[in-house]
Regions:
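A residue-level marker of the well-folded mature domains of exported/periplasmic proteins
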Residues: 1-166
Length: 166
C-alpha cells in the first residue's frame, strides 16, 4: 500500500526493519538527517524515539502508527487503532475456519493494553463465530515480549500438538 501511494504522488519509499530497540533513534536519524518529507514509525515502542526526532527535526513530518502522543507535537501525528475490533475480526475468522474446534493465539505481553485488548477481541470473535471452539491464548512475560521468536515458535508448536489448527 505504501509503495502504491508513493507511486501515485511521484514519491518513493525506503524502510529499515529495526531488530533492537536501542537502534530506533539512530535508524530514524538516517532518514531525518537526509530531509525526508515524511517518516513513518510503527509500534508503540518507537513512540519516544519518534517524539524526540520530531522535536529535533521540525521540518520533517512524522507519523507514529500505534503511538499515542500525550502532548501535541506539530509535526507528529499518532495513529491509534481499535485493537479489540481487529482481534475480534481475526478471532471470528478463526472460529469459522477451524476444523478441529481448537484455535490459539501467541501474543506479546498482556501488560501492554493494546495487546491485551487484541487478545480479548480475538477470544470474543472466536466465541461468536463458533461457541463450541476451545480457545488458547498465551502471553509472553513482560521482559523481551516483542523480540523472542524462539518462545513464539515453541508456544505455537505446543498449541498445534494439542490439536489447534488455527
Amino acid at each position: 500500500g505504501t509503495q502504491l501511494a508513493a507511486a501515485e504522488v511521484g514519491g518513493f519509499t525506503k524502510y529499515i526493519e529495526t531488530t533492537d530497540p536501542k537502534d530506533y533513534q539512530s535508524n530514524i536519524e538516517q532518514f531525518a538527517s537526509k530531509d525526508y518529507d515524511t517518516i513513518v514509525t510503527v509500534g508503540f515502542l518507537m513512540a519516544e524515539a519518534a517524539t524526540a526526532a520530531a522535536a529535533e527535526y521540525p521540518n520533517v513530518n512524522f507519523i507514529g502508527v500505534d503511538q499515542f502522543q500525550a502532548a501535541e507535537v506539530p509535526n507528529l501525528t499518532g495513529l491509534v487503532f481499535s485493537e479489540d475490533k481487529a482481534g475480534y475480526a481475526a478471532g471470528y475468522l478463526a472460529g469459522l475456519m477451524t476444523q478441529t474446534n481448537k484455535v490459539g493465539a501467541v501474543l506479546g505481553t498482556d501488560t501492554v493494553p493494546p495487546v491485551f485488548l487484541f487478545g480479548e477481541g480475538y477470544r470474543n470473535g472466536v466465541a461468536a463465530a463458533n461457541p463450541e471452539a476451545e480457545i488458547t491464548i498465551v502471553y509472553h512475560e513482560p521482559n523481551n515480549a516483542f523480540n523472542d521468536p524462539e518462545w513464539g515458535a515453541a508456544e505455537a508448536k505446543k498449541q498445534l500438538t494439542q490439536g489447534a489448527d488455527i
